[in-house]
Amino acid sequence: MSTSLSVTELQVENFTFPPTVKPPGSTKTLFLGGAGERGLEIQGKFIKFTAIGVYLEDSAVNCLGVKWKGKSAVELTESVEFFRDVVTGDFEKFIRVTMILPLTGQQYSEKVSENCVAIWKSLGIYTDAEAKAIEKFIEVFKDENFPPGSSILFTISGQGSLTIGFSKDSSVPEGGKVVIENKLLANSVLESVIGKNGVSPAAKESLASRLSPLFNDCGADSEKPQS
């Protein structure tokens, strides 16, 4: 049975993330790995800015399950290495960032770009290719505005290309607005959500709690004795 058949939708604030989706620029149907909000503590109050859903290709379960099967949701949540494996895994991923509060494209792209460049420079891996990819990333967001309920859509191919799309409602367009061929940038977009310093601990926890039982189920059929 495919993973897509065994997962459920998730609600974050007033937004529903369906159990499966066909991302922009993709021919595949991905399943909902997890979802959660991104927010900040401001003057003693937790303000939620965006709801984020992370979708994965079915093959991710077997890919990751080889190493992580048998681990509890808590163990996965606390493992930096686990989320790194999700980010770098050779399977398709899709991220939907839905606005709870309004945001301009410029605000969003500048924040993501600053974080990416700072990390790359600290690791000594910031080259001309990354500089050009960041320029393209900022350009596509330049004239965009995102009212509540609108979404930014990121499709990350197994080869590492990043397709960026936008939606003003719950629909998902067939194609993206731009494709950026830079694996480092593609991975960093997901890393910024679920990595070591990811902006959505809730999405990380959700991902771990939903994938843990799927890992334990994977391979169950192949382990049965042949009749």
UniProtKB/Swiss-Prot annotation:
GO terms for biological process: flavonoid biosynthetic process; pigmentation; response to auxin; response to karrikin; response to UV; response to UV-B. It catalyses: a chalcone = a flavanone. Substrate binds at T50, N115, S192. GO terms for molecular function: chalcone isomerase activity. Gene3D superfamilies: 1.10.890.20, 3.50.70.10. Pathway: Secondary metabolite biosynthesis; flavonoid biosynthesis. One of its GO terms (cellular component) is plant-type vacuole membrane. Keywords: Flavonoid biosynthesis, Isomerase. Its EC number is 5.5.1.6. The record marks Y108 as: Important for catalytic activity. InterPro entries: CFI (IPR044164), Chalcone_isomerase (IPR016087), Chalcone_isomerase_3-sand (IPR016088), Chalcone_isomerase_bundle_sf (IPR016089), Chalcone_isomerase_sf (IPR036298). The keyword Isomerase applies. Pfam families: Chalcone (PF02431). The keyword Isomerase applies. Fibers. Catalyzes the intramolecular cyclization of bicyclic chalcones into tricyclic (S)-flavanones. Responsible for the isomerization of 4,2',4',6'-tetrahydroxychalcone (also termed chalcone) into naringenin. Belongs to the chalcone isomerase family. Part of the biosynthetic pathway for all classes of flavonoids, a large class of secondary plant metabolites, many of which are brightly colored. This is Chalcone--flavanone isomerase. It comes from Gossypium hirsutum (Upland cotton). The gene is CHI.
